[in-house]
């Protein structure tokens, strides 16, 4: 084999990424960042033929963590040496993989150290009707801008926190936001995040502090799930390892843990 690793574009590896998505059968975590040009993409060529690709992401400008790596099946006997060449050329420093991304997680165990767990990833398993009278769930509209600004531009709006009113107005126009209301006003905010690989959408929610421990979160998740399916998409979700409350809410809403994120530091190559 004569392997070459060269920068490329997301369009040039689109067919390979389609095969990768079919094998993963899950939402691709960094799909939005990839489409926004916030990653580094490299093709893997053998004698001029494109046989695979890899993508690196990271915090800030340090895009040195491998988050996708794929080779066509007939070349996978050579996965480890090709990966070693890939990480050397790209000056990769680490690997991040989900436990259901079999190819990359095996490379993570084979070639990294100091492995630490990260987010939990969930798939929907069942419908769990939530009986919580007096709640209303609806789409967020431009008329909600004033009332949402003091929430969504502060830490209370996390994980949907936005930097300013203008960014919030843009987000509202995307039609991703959902509002949960009770007799006292805004009780929670949900989201159906588009822009991921078909047929998946990532969903999320936050419940206002005054409305917590009432079952509102599970109700909101079920409503957002129902609407996601009505759009012809399959809902997926994730949460941080420290967020036990959100994890419990997702489980109560019919989700099951589908995978766990792992991150490791690449060992020095001789």
Question: How would you describe each model-predicted region?
Answer:
Residues 1-27, 127-161:
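Short amphipathic alpha-helix that is part of the acyltransferase structural core
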Residues 90-101, 228-240:
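Conserved GNAT acetyl-CoA-binding A-motif
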Residues 75-88, 213-228, 247-252:
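Conserved acetyl-CoA-binding loop-helix of GNAT-fold acetyltransferases
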Residues 58-63, 70-135, 264-266:
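Acyl-donor-binding surface of acyltransferase catalytic domains
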Residues 107-109, 250, 255:
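Conserved active-site tyrosine of GNAT-family acetyltransferases
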Residues 176-234:
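Glycine/small-residue-rich hydrophobic helix-like segments
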Residues 28-90, 187-202, 206-209:
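Conserved donor-binding loop and adjoining core beta-sheet/short helix segment
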Residues 21-41, 157-179:
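Active-site rim helix/loop that mediates acceptor-substrate recognition in acyltransferases
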